[in-house]
Amino acid sequence: MIRAFDAFSLPLLRLFDAEDAHRLAIQGLRLLPQVKPRPDDPKLAVRAFGLNFPNPVGIAAGFDKNAEAPDALMRLGFGFVEIGTVTPKPQAGNPRPRLFRLERDEAVINRMGFNNDGSEAVLRRLAARAQQGGILGVNVGANKDSSDRVADYVALIETFAPVASYFTVNVSSPNTPGLRNLQQAAALDDLLARVIEARERVRPSAGDTPVLLKIAPDLTLGELDDVVHIARSRKVDGMIVANTTLSRSPLLRERTRMNEQGGLSGRPLFRLSTRMVAETYVRAEGAFPLIGVGGIDSGGAALTKIRAGASLVQLYSALIYKGLGLVESIKTDLASTLLRTGRDSLAEIVGADAPTITAEEWPV
């Protein structure tokens, strides 16, 4: 069924503006038959952040910003779904056009600006599907015009704790002016302290919801030292590495699009984000697991991310070019690798290549 859907939808969606195509894709997912996914190979199961993931392949925030199709995505075989970024108040985001395909590079540039329906509408949707199960993360961010951005994060933790499997604190989007300043040491320490306090306040009624921190790939190694140190000291449950990049590789082929303002994702981000996964893994010293994001478009790419230090991986941009069948393809490749190498689980290879990767020349 998925192959047929991809064969029909991918050429059709290319005829539309990138954002319109995305909107159509979300609507199309909601129309798919409610067929149970094929059972995952038990060897692909991952335990991380106190949660049991059926497989390590998730969909990154940004695809289903408003929690319109999380269950359809789970039925497609994703091991977990992350919705958002959600802000307290509804937000229109930046003016269009704000989403661009770089087709020859299999990349995307976006400057969306946290466009979303706001916490009230998204909470209503999540509450309505609360009995469906599955691991559903909520990616939270601050409103652009907020006078107290930290208070926005705190409010969102308190709002979504009853329905979130985990939280992602997004301080790394490049498309909200000043947001990345929250990655600076003093600001980040204050933010995480208040977020963890909020989580503790709602624990009696909502349980112990893991809190993850999502970082940019553009941090210097000195800045990464500070970020990981603070994350460890504030006892966050994990990190997501990494968001989109503001850098532009000279190897990009779509010269007319490459200088569009915004964050770059997709295949050109793979080497940089993988290096940042390895650097973070080495610094975390086993304190918490990582989710690796950026340029994963095959089973081999997912395996590289895992061997760099990621316990789980997330996709988004590659789905635009490879289709939804990519999910099962990656899982099949990972299971085959475990069988071929005589491994019982992916946990046995997490971080195996991190020392080698961190010793390599910095990626261009």
From Swiss-Prot:
Cofactor annotation remark: Binds 1 FMN per subunit.
GO MF, one term, reads: dihydroorotate dehydrogenase (quinone) activity
Q: Which residues bind substrate?
A: K65, N110, R111, M112, G113, F114, N170, N175, N243, T244
Quick one: signal sequence residues? Answer: none
Q: How does it assemble?
A: Monomer.
Instruction: Extract the NCBIfam families matched here.
Output: PRK05286.1-2 (NF003645), PRK05286.2-5 (NF003652), pyrD_sub2 (TIGR01036)
Q: What is this protein called?
A: Dihydroorotate dehydrogenase (quinone)
User: Whose protein is this, by species?
Assistant: Rhodopseudomonas palustris (strain BisB5)
Biological classification of the source: Bacteria, Pseudomonadati, Pseudomonadota, Alphaproteobacteria, Hyphomicrobiales
